[in-house]
Regions:
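Multi-pass alpha-helical transmembrane bundle typical of ion/small-solute transporters
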Residues: 5-6, 12-362
Length: 362
């Protein structure tokens, strides 16, 4: 059992106002998951659309199916890490969670509008941290292994993606050096269906779990509200961060898949064609390299950015042709967007938390 530092009066509990507020925040968290799928769908489909293997509509359907299928293949290590590894749970209350979510949502929508492939994952972590610090100061952050891993991943995940994309492309080009480009393209158009599916599964596996972690952290912090419930609300009584309710898993994977179906065409254009021109063989290597890095991180419970990783893989593939094949000016702008994501989302969440606390004190 976890102690919580926020108190609820009997009258407010009795009339259900706080219970309804917590339920509303769960809905907002699932809405963030939808926006994550909408915003980051480009990660999974940019290369397969850029190489014209699938139309945008067919690509998002393909990606959504494999986003959801991650439910059956991966655990919940990332969710547990986000729930317990970053913020002191004794600081968490519904306003902190809602402030963090709204900060991340605002940043995601701004970057989507301007077609910038920033990280939904780091926006969520930054928003969560910003709201907690706004409430309790810097001591709200649990400085330790998970922060080190996540901050390191900001640099290492795109670098690892770039290296994997580069190495796979070199290996594949050597293996197929005696095959005509027409035959190679025909083969990799089919192979890219597999690599795109693998990347979509990796995206769902890592990103949907971040929303699960936020919801479970909220439910554990709010457990006193749901103790003794016998109706449907009994499913919201969670006392341990080690247990992810099935309805939370189903909800998170469903919403990220529906978001992916909605697409994010501005970012698809940026990542699929503007960073570097790709042929099917390049798309296959970028997707496979990016997916392997993300799945490796997911296996060890590290919340990485799928956006960072696949963009790095695309750059690595482009660099095997010649360095000038990569539009480094555009790539540098994307890097700057990555750098400012955590502090920008944190600032927005901090302001949002203060507004919520002023108008809805708990």
């Amino acid at each position: 059992m976890y102690r919580t530092c926020w108190k609820v009066s009997r009258s407010r509990t009795a009339d259900g106002s706080v219970v309804n507020f917590v339920i509303f925040i769960v809905a907002v968290a699932l809405a963030f998951d939808f926006i994550n799928g909408f915003h980051d769908s480009a990660n999974s489909i940019a290369t397969i659309v850029g190489t014209r293997v699938l139309s945008p509509l067919a690509a998002v359907i393909w990606a959504a199916v494999f986003n959801f299928s991650a439910l059956f293949f991966v655990g919940t290590g990332v969710a547990k890490a986000l729930a317990a590894g970053f913020i002191d749970l004794n600081v968490v209350d519904p306003n902190v969670i809602l402030g963090g979510l709204l900060g991340a949502i605002i940043w995601n929508l701004l970057t989507w509008y301007f077609g910038i492939p920033s990280s939904s994952s780091h926006a969520l972590i930054g928003g969560y941290a910003g709201a907690a610090v706004s409430k309790a100061g810097i001591t709200a952050l649990l400085w330790g292994r998970k922060w080190i891993e996540t901050l390191s991943a900001i640099v290492l995940s795109p670098a690892a993606g770039m290296l994997m994309g580069f190495v796979l492309m070199v290996v594949v080009l050597n293996l197929f050096r005696r095959v005509t480009s027409t035959k190679a393209d025909r083969f990799f158009r089919v192979a890219q269906l597999t690599s795109s599916a693998l990347l979509s599964l990796a995206h769902g596996a890592n990103d949907a779990q971040k929303t699960m972690g936020i919801i479970v952290g909220l439910l554990v912090a709010s457990q006193a509200l749901f103790a003794g419930e016998t109706g449907i609300l009994r499913h919201m009584y969670v006392t341990s961060l080690d247990t992810i309710p099935l309805w939370v898993e189903l909800g998170a994977y469903t919403m990220i898949s529906l978001g992916t179906l909605s697409g994010g065409w501005r970012i698809v254009h940026t990542m699929g064609t503007r960073i570097t021109k790709l042929r099917p063989v390049g798309g296959f290597c970028a997707e496979t390299g990016g997916a392997l890095v993300i799945l490796f991180a997911t296996r060890f419970g590290i919340p990485v950015s799928t956006t960072h990783t696949i963009t790095g893989a695309i750059v690595g593939v482009g660099a095997t042709n010649r360095l000038s094949a990569v539009r480094w000016g555009l790539a540098s702008k994307i890097v700057w967007a990555w750098v400012i994501t955590i502090p920008a989302a944190a600032a927005m969440a901090a302001i949002t938390y203060q507004l919520l606390a002023a108008f809805n004190p708990l």
